[in-house]
Amino acid sequence: MKNVKCLLVAGLILFVGNTSAESRRQKVGIFGTEVQFTPFGHDDDYSLNSLKFRYFMTDKDALRLKIGFGVESLKYEDDEFGGNLEKGRLGDLSVDLGYERHFKVAKRLSLYAGVQVGVYKHFASAKVEYTEDLGNGSHTYQVVYKNCVPTSEGNVGERAHVGVAASVFTGLDFYVYKGLYLGTEVGIYVMSTKTNQTELKYSDKVIKGTDTYRAVICNAIKPMVRLGWTF
């Protein structure tokens, strides 16, 4: 039995050795697609947050298209919010176009670095039911928040905005077998954003916000886990 186990291990080693030379598939004309996960995302949730497509112009140079997305449902504790939150959503959508330069580290391992630019949209909306005590009774009404969500006091809180961004990044690709690979990526980005006009609607009244503002944000890209395939 022990000899059989030794033969199996030896065979596995020979198999990996024979396939490792063809495991790294980064050649001119190769197309790749991958999903990207953020293990340390919002509230430490492990969530899928983007798709990436890659095309190798040469054995070392690749163009990339990245589409990012995410949706979060709002929740309030009963003692923190003055109304009944019927519906609340925060969302994000981004489209980035970039360039990667690849460096062979080993037969199965590739290091790359690059730059990208893109556009970004942050969504925010909510629908809340409030009950007002009038002394001799109560009055219930609904408020629709557009391009914003309420604070725990019912005021305008987080707002929707649009932006443009540029980033630099570096990452690793480890080819498990032929075109299948695992990887990670980190980087930094600079983004210029502008808030959208807010709107509160209740009964027959509409209150539109008059203030919009711009902001410049510089931050690190959270480490991500990537699973991809080249063909």
What feature does the model see in each segment?
Residues 2-11, 18-34:
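Outer-membrane beta-barrel biogenesis signature
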Residues 32, 39-40, 151-152, 158-159, ...:
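Short leucine-rich amphipathic alpha-helices used at interfaces
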Residues 34-48, 70, 107:
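Solvent-exposed loop/turn segments connecting transmembrane beta-strands
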Residues 37-41, 89-96, 202-203:
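Short, charged, low-hydrophobicity "junction" segments
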Residues 38-42, 84-88, 155-160, 210-214:
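Outer-membrane beta-barrel domain signature
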Residues 52-152, 159-166, 174-180, 218-231:
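Gram-negative (and chloroplast) outer-membrane scaffold detector with strong preference
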Residues 176-231:
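Predominantly the C-terminal beta-signal and adjacent terminal strand-loop region
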